Amino acid sequence: MPTQTTPFQGTKFYLGTGLTEGKTVTAVTVKPNATITSAGHGAKVGDFIKLTGLGALDGYYPVKAVTNDLITLADEVDWTSQDAPASYAAAKVATVKWSSNFCAIKQIEGDGDTLGEEDITTMCSEGTETEAGEIEYGSIKLTFFYAPGTAMQADLRKKFHAKETFPWMMILKNSQGSLYGTGFIQTSPNFSGEVKGKFESGVTIKKTKRDYHLPA
């Protein structure tokens, strides 16, 4: 089987700009698949939705499938260790609104998440024993041509100064699916220019929770 590769050109990157009006959630299943039921939700396959009023299940999740009022979340969304909510009185679902594609990007660099290390050495240990600790989420560095007067780059500055946590989405080429997550601008837009060149800029988005991959 030939090696599969994923070209950079043709990738799409979006930032969340808001949410649709929240719709009432009337049911949730936690196993075998994570699903929610909401009449008139308006979500479609590939959307990123925000759940509120569901306690430990609150958060942003990609949509894998839609059947009438039933929304099935991505396979990576694992709720099997959670309890279904006892009440849906305040439960809502809203769909993320996206910016236009950030076409000025020339490089995307994602730092992987890392696991901390816990020392579990005891007096019976023959040496130092460790186990996996807490996850520290990585970051995404975007490098792009500097144009602070454009709507996209103005929004980056706004998000930084507002200390906003926002959704992001990257759609890959060659049927490799999409990545979804949330984060905040850790480093505001920098800039660099020189003679016979063009200004370049970049930002660092610190991930606030795990990301999710939704296959094509």
Regions found by a protein language model. Name each.
Residues P2-G10, T17-P32, S38-H41, L54-E126:
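Small/polar beta-strand repeat architecture
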Residues L15-T17, L51-G55, M170-Q176:
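Short acidic, glycine-rich loop/turn motifs
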Residues M152-T182:
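Short, acidic/charged, Gly/Pro-enriched secondary-structure junctions
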Residues M170-P215:
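Short beta-strand and beta-hairpin "edge-sheet" elements
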